[in-house]
Amino acid sequence: MSNAKKFGVFLVVLLCAACMFVFIYTLVKLSLQEGESSSRLTQAVVNQIGEAAFDEELDANQIHALNLFLRTMAHFVLFSILSFGMCTIAFLVFAHPAGRFFGLVLNMLICAALAYGTEYFKQFVDGRHFQIEDAWLNIYGVIIGLCSFLIADLIFWAIRARSSSQSE
């Protein structure tokens, strides 16, 4: 591999790592905010969605259901994105298949620790509490992110193999 290509890969890894660091910081910052602030933020988003999606004002049951849906999807989607991004970094850092497998296993351990840790440390924040259901949603998000990455990698590999066989 040429030095220019190595430098390009280094820059991509550095950019991905910086983006993931910012993402993790934001995730932890949001996760560990005071309970009242978190509730106000979610309620404001629920009200905006309700106003945009429906012409009438939402009743208490609809507000509760939408609030639950948003919080559930936030856990799930955030950790899916985190896992997908960290898998991308692992594949850029490790070139050989054994190294990539190690990178994916390390990724899963880091993401699972973050998934559980963000929930665990909520109990030390005013107005927040630990919920094992949320920790499991986070871990399911990590698994979906990994599976999505592996599917995307297989599709990319198949396209690349097909294009190289057609060029011969």
Model region roles, listed by residue range:
Residues A115-I143:
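Interfacial helix-loop-helix junctions of multi-pass membrane proteins
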Residues V77-F94, Y140-F156:
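Membrane-interfacial alpha-helical segments at the cytosolic side of multi-pass membrane proteins
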Residues S2-C87:
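"…centered on the first transmembrane helix and the immediately adjacent amphipathic helix/loop
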Residues A95-A112:
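Internal alpha-helical transmembrane segments of multi-pass membrane proteins
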Residues R160-E168:
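Short, charged juxtamembrane terminal tails flanking transmembrane helices
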Residues V22-L27, C111-T118:
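Alpha-helical transmembrane segments of multi-pass membrane proteins
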Residues A4-A18, F102-V105, C147, I151-I159:
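Alpha-helical hydrophobic membrane-insertion segments
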